[in-house]
Curated annotation (Swiss-Prot):
Record function comment: F(1)F(0) ATP synthase produces ATP from ADP in the presence of a proton or sodium gradient. F-type ATPases consist of two structural domains, F(1) containing the extramembraneous catalytic core and F(0) containing the membrane proton channel, linked together by a central stalk and a peripheral stalk. During catalysis, ATP synthesis in the catalytic domain of F(1) is coupled via a rotary mechanism of the central stalk subunits to proton translocation. This protein is part of the stalk that links CF(0) to CF(1). It either transmits conformational changes from CF(0) to CF(1) or is implicated in proton conduction.
Protein name: ATP synthase subunit delta
GO molecular function, one term: proton-transporting ATP synthase activity, rotational mechanism
Keyword Transmembrane among UniProt keywords: no
Subunit structure: F-type ATPases have 2 components, F(1) - the catalytic core - and F(0) - the membrane proton channel. F(1) has five subunits: alpha(3), beta(3), gamma(1), delta(1), epsilon(1). F(0) has three main subunits: a(1), b(2) and c(10-14). The alpha and beta chains form an alternating ring which encloses part of the gamma chain. F(1) is attached to F(0) by a central stalk formed by the gamma and epsilon chains, while a peripheral stalk is formed by the delta and b chains.
A Pfam family hit: OSCP
NCBIfam families per the UniProt record, alphabetical: ATP_synt_delta, PRK13434.1
Membrane topology, from the record: Peripheral membrane protein
Localisation: Cell inner membrane
InterPro entries the UniProt entry points to: ATP_synth_OSCP/delta_N_sf, ATPase_OSCP/dsu
GO cellular component: plasma membrane; proton-transporting ATP synthase complex
UniProt entry keywords in alphabetical sequence: ATP synthesis, Cell inner membrane, Cell membrane, CF(1), Hydrogen ion transport, Ion transport, Membrane, Transport
Length: 186
């Protein structure tokens, strides 16, 4: 099974087993950062010379009472099956699966100039109405657009930027070649 298949399998299993998916989603995100951001911590948990029992003791000692039992047990399963390295990808896949279950769509919005919060909220509202889903917008500024915005989600791209409009005009002008010797007057 490839890495994305492993991640999807574990994420789906965890989502099916939990009664508090939003809490688990937050915990997985925090743990993925905690365990894989610091090189010493990452190396400890990925080291083949440290036993899984020792790794599990460290997790239990430091996390019991601070995260839900299901998340702690899940980490133990990942350790014992040699899958802890997949935690960051499992966390991402868990979020994808939870979003599907909740009818949410995460969209990347690039704009120039940067969207004001009210504009982003209005765009989210329009998208939600049009696509019958709750939209979570991840907004960033992109000066290469010259003006306007680009929205990307799933396999869809909505492009309303000056750069794309100029590209369309250029393409249109190049396609409409004038016949040799033709003279046009206004």
């Amino acid at each position: 099974m490839n890495d994305s298949g492993v991640s999807k399998t574990y994420a789906s299993a965890l989502l099916g087993a939990t009664n508090v998916p939003e809490e688990v989603e937050q915990e997985l995100g925090d743990l993925a950062q905690l365990l894989f951001k610091d090189e010493k911590v990452k190396n400890f948990f990925l080291s083949p010379t440290v036993s899984n029992e020792e790794k599990e003791k460290v997790l239990i000692k430091n996390l019991r009472g601070k995260i839900s039992d299901i998340t702690l047990n899940f980490l133990g399963v990942l350790l014992n099956r040699g899958r802890i390295i997949h935690l960051p990808e499992i966390q991402k896949q868990f979020t994808v699966e939870l979003d599907k279950k909740k009818g949410r769509v995460r969209a990347q919005v690039r704009s120039y100039p940067s969207l004001e919060p009210a504009q982003a909220a209005k765009l989210g509202s329009i998208l939600s109405e049009k696509f019958k889903s709750e939209f979570i917008l991840e907004v960033s500024e992109d000066k290469s657009l010259l003006g306007g915005f680009v929205v990307q989600f799933n396999d869809l791209k909505i492009e309303k930027s000056i750069a794309s409009q100029l590209g369309e005009i250029k393409k249109s002008m190049l396609e409409k070649k004038l016949p040799v010797g033709a003279i046009y007057e206004n």
